[in-house]
Amino acid sequence: MVKLKGLRQINPYVAGKQPDEPDMIKLNTNENAYGPSPKVAEALQNFDAQELRKYSSLDQAELCQALAANLGVSPDQLIIGNGSDDILSMAFLAFFNSGESVLFSDLTYGFYKVWADLYQVPFREIPLTADFEVHPSDYFGDNGGIILANPNAPTGIYLPLKQLEEILASNQDAVVVVDEAYINFGGQSALPLLDTYPNLFITRTFSKDAALAGLRVGYGIGHPDLIAVMKAVKDSINPYSVDLLAERLALAAVQDWDYYLETGRAIQETRDWFAEELAALDFQVLPSQTNFVLAQPTRISAAELFQQLEERQIYVRYFPKAERIKDFLRISIGRREEMETVLAAIKEICSS
């Protein structure tokens, strides 16, 4: 590496592979197999490319209005970003500046640790229980803030709202960020707690339930005072972070939310069926409220199953460097016919 002063050394986030093969089944990055709403496709077709000569809006007012009506909050409780990763990254800059350690789980979304390192925020990883669950009392006591994925990734396990409220009630002098990327696959949102806990900040994405991972739109929900701090950070980095096309297509998605409720139900039904089928093959399957399952094979190693699935152009996620789940595979939930093909391949591999 070239030797120059001031170069930053950091361990970056490692994303899942993005293969592009015609007959593959891609189940490694929790994308939505059903695709965007037809209204999104219509909005894309009707978009006037001449509009791209102008900068996008600063506050995404129309999208905020639609989201506010959908969620039952006011527009001043919302901020839109370039994916929920953008919102979460800004949250580290906006909320975690006390000098005390920020708390998050030892087995959760890998970006949290990366952002803490990047922004030089002290942190402490709280071990999940032996059953991969969050124990609320582990988050009591002095800290510089908390960030929890609920449901968690990569485990898929959901923390009941009552237990989440225990954490909020015990940390009212610090911001508690709840990452709800997967909340619409069976969990109960923390939205009802917003009026009681001004220290609560929720993040959401259009990548999972709205099938717009390639568009990069996410949002944060919280007390107007928290939103004001977030907007100040956003305007200090890139006030135009949400492009015009993304805003228009996200708006079309919100306006056709019944479509996503329907596809979400289909994903949940397929997930529950697939989990039962894996359990019948002696897999240990963690209870999931997401669009994926984390499962441990017992008749074959996770590494071998991962390799043999990949040879069949079936891509799942393997975490060989994560000690607690190195014997597990994370498998996204596709359409029923895709999952039947995957199940048949797993049966063939496990019986050979």
Swiss-Prot record:
Cited NCBIfam families: hisC
Catalytic activity, reaction form: L-histidinol phosphate + 2-oxoglutarate = 3-(imidazol-4-yl)-2-oxopropyl phosphate + L-glutamate
Q: In which pathway does it act?
A: Amino-acid biosynthesis; L-histidine biosynthesis; L-histidine from 5-phospho-alpha-D-ribose 1-diphosphate: step 7/9
For this protein, the record's InterPro entries field holds: Aminotransferase_I/II_large, HisP_aminotrans, HistidinolP_aminotransfase, PyrdxlP-dep_Trfase, PyrdxlP-dep_Trfase_major, PyrdxlP-dep_Trfase_small
Names of required cofactors: pyridoxal 5'-phosphate
Record-level GO BP terms: L-histidine biosynthetic process
- Quaternary structure, from the entry: Homodimer.
What Pfam families is this protein classified in?
Answer: Aminotran_1_2
User: In this chain, where does the modification N6-(pyridoxal phosphate)lysine occur?
Assistant: K208
**Enzyme nomenclature, EC number:** 2.6.1.9
Listed A to Z, the keywords are: Amino-acid biosynthesis, Aminotransferase, Histidine biosynthesis, Pyridoxal phosphate, Transferase
What family classification does the UniProt entry report for this protein?
Answer: Belongs to the class-II pyridoxal-phosphate-dependent aminotransferase family. Histidinol-phosphate aminotransferase subfamily.
Q: Which CDD domains does UniProt cross-reference here?
A: AAT_like (cd00609)
Q: Is the Amino-acid biosynthesis keyword given for this protein?
A: yes
Enzyme class of the recorded protein, top EC level: transferase
Descriptive protein name: Histidinol-phosphate aminotransferase
